[in-house]
A protein has these predicted regions:
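Surface-exposed, proline-anchored Ser/Thr-rich loop/turn motifs
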Residues: 80-83, 187-207
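Short tyrosine-centred short linear motifs in exposed loops/low-complexity segments
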Residues: 9-13, 146-149
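Ser/Thr- and Asn-enriched, surface-exposed coil loops between beta-strands
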Residues: 30-31, 132-134, 205-207
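A broad "non-catalytic interaction surface" signal
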Residues: 39-187
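Extracytoplasmic/periplasmic beta-strand context in beta-sandwich domains
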Residues: 15, 30, 34, 153, ...
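Intrinsically disordered, low-complexity Pro/Gly/Ser/Thr-rich segments with frequent PxxP/GP/PP motifs
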Residues: 1-9
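Short, exposed coil/turn segments at beta-strand boundaries within extracellular/luminal domains
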Residues: 23-32, 170-175
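Enriched for extracellular/lumenal, surface-exposed ectodomains of secreted and cell-surface proteins
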Residues: 7, 14-28, 156-165
Length: 207
């Protein structure tokens, strides 16, 4: 028999197959069990020894001060809407200088962060600096035509050299963090600020 299942969501899946034929005289081989675990690639890097990596990441509604979690963290609960075609400020704090940063958005949801999904190619924080606290802000543009909907966004750092093209590659010093972004065509009216605006209310026929 043929049976297809959707294993696209992260987690562990239990697989069980069982046969119960009347003419089966060997019941010892009737049951097959296995498990499949689907996780995003989690690169290894040292972000604790010298405070490399990210101590703060801010983008739109995401404001995440964090420590080192073995070089990789998936903040699946942190999500923000981003409008296709718009440019956003990204603020990052690191604990060591010479940190190169790249950002990808997995538009096709295949868990492979390819070069054409890169939205920040190479930004260096605190060039030539050593240990300390460095905060810098740079810009990220969501390209026109990007696939709408919810996707994983990966930000990755590497000390003293450009982040590898392979977003799953381990590095000696740095950190990788994954977030969730929701790409939309425009924000609702409630998302627009009306600071310093003058509102005039008209009454028509006492209604």
């Amino acid at each position: 028999f043929n049976q297809t299942v959707d294993l696209s969501s992260f987690g562990t899946y239990a697989m069980v197959a069982y046969s119960s034929l009347d003419t089966d005289f060997d019941p010892t081989n009737d049951l097959w069990q296995s498990s499949i675990t689907n996780i995003n690639c989690s690169p290894v890097a040292d972000c604790a020894g010298y405070d490399d990596g990210f101590q703060l990441f801010q983008l739109a509604d995401i404001d995440n001060p964090s420590g080192c979690e073995g070089g990789y963290s998936y903040f699946s609960n942190l999500c923000t809407d981003l409008v296709v075609g718009d440019t956003y400020d990204v603020t990052v704090t690191t604990g060591y200088g010479d940190q190169h940063v790249r950002i990808w958005i997995d538009y096709n949801d295949d868990f492979i962060f390819s070069l054409d999904e890169m939205v920040v190619s190479d930004y260096e924080i605190a060039n030539g600096q050593g240990q300390g606290s460095y905060t810098e802000t740079f810009q990220m543009t969501i390209p026109e035509g990007a696939v709408l909907g919810t996707h994983i966004m990966r930000i990755k750092s590497n000390w003293q050299s450009q982040v590898p093209d392979d977003a799953c590659e381990d590095t000696t010093y740095g950190e990788t963090e994954d977030y969730t972004v929701n790409l939309v065509t425009s924000l609702g009216f409630g998302d627009f600020e009306l600071n310093n605006s003058e509102l005039i209310i008209y009454s028509t026929d006492n209604k």
